[in-house]
């Protein structure tokens, strides 16, 4: 945080765009910054609830809270503490890696890369959402505020549930996973299961074949990207978000009577890996 405040941030947009930004105001305590109009959460899903509690000193009676974190269940964590009319959810399609303090490499997809919207519509969430959309757009990020965020949120959950555990288990980038017929088949099986669960819930989402065709294009846009779960499993040895991805799809599948055998198995494998980092050979 001190490095960013004093020297700014160096951004590399893969493969060869470079930017330097100054003027960041940073703090390690929400108690030091006053009451905010909006608070955006961009933690790991496993860290969100602690982050919500830690942010309490800067959250006033009109503050809008926005989770841009991948995975199912982030809305429930917000609603545990704040009313739906002040809460928004969303997600992005921008893979990132922090190479060093103040240095970030991103692997964005083409088109819209950030989507967000209200859990329950209110004039305040609409006003904040449209302002946030403008800030993103002015900064060069193609972002869209949407009244109905669920189709896009589920699309990202299914995509991450496909890419994250499969590539982590195979220890491959998304491009190398996609290029291998067996890896691609595993991606596709999760997508088909996730789409079936979403449709059973009444989510207006594209058909599985269309989803897979679109996913193949995105894998080839950023083939070198190593997703965060693969980083956690292979390099950092950290707890993963598996329970909010394939684990959550499996749970929803049981509720709605949709079989999810691939999601079930991937959840077990990643859970076993992260439970035994210190014993691996």
Where are these regions (language model features)?
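Glycine-rich phosphate-binding loop and adjoining beta1-alpha1-beta2 segment
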Residues: 1-19
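Short, hinge-like loop/turn segments at secondary-structure boundaries
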Residues: 9-14, 83-84, 104-108, 161-163, ...
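Rossmann-like NAD(P)(H) cofactor-binding subdomain of soluble oxidoreductases
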Residues: 18-104
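Rossmann-fold dinucleotide-binding core
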Residues: 34, 70-156
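Helix-loop-beta segment of a Rossmann-like dinucleotide-binding subdomain
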Residues: 59, 103-118, 168-178, 226-234
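Active-site-proximal catalytic alpha-helix in oxidoreductases
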Residues: 150-178, 182-195, 223
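NAD(P)-dependent Rossmann-like dehydrogenase/reductase catalytic/cofactor-binding core
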Residues: 184-281
């Amino acid at each position: 945080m001190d490095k960013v405040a004093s020297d700014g941030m160096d951004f590399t947009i893969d493969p060869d765009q470079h930017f330097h930004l100054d003027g960041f105001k940073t703090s390690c305590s929400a108690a030091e910054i006053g009451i905010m109009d909006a608070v955006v959460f961009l933690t790991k899903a496993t860290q969100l609830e602690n982050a919500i509690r830690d942010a309490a000193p800067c959250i006033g009676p009109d503050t809008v809270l926005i989770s841009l974190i991948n995975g199912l269940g982030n809305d429930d964590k917000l609603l545990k503490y704040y009313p739906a009319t002040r809460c928004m959810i969303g997600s992005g399609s921008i893979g990132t890696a922090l190479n060093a303090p103040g240095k970030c490499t991103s692997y964005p997809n083409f088109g819209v890369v950030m989507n967000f919207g209200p859990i329950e519509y209110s004039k305040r969430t609409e006003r904040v959402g449209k302002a946030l959309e403008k800030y993103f757009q002015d900064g060069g990020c193609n972002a869209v505020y949407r009244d109905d965020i669920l189709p896009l949120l589920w699309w990202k959950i299914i995509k991450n549930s496909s890419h994250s555990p499969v590539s982590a288990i195979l220890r491959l980038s998304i491009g190398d996973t996609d290029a291998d017929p067996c890896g691609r088949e595993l991606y596709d099986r999760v997508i088909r299961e996730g789409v079936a669960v979403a449709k059973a819930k009444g989510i207006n989402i594209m058909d599985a074949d269309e989803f897979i065709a679109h996913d193949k294009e995105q894998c080839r846009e950023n083939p070198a990207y190593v997703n965060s779960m693969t980083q956690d499993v292979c390099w950092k040895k950290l707890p993963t978000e598996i329970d909010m991805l394939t684990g959550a799809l499996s749970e929803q599948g049981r509720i709605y009577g949709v079989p999810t055998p691939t999601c079930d198995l991937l959840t077990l494998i990643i859970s076993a890996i992260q439970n035994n980092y210190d014993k691996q050979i």
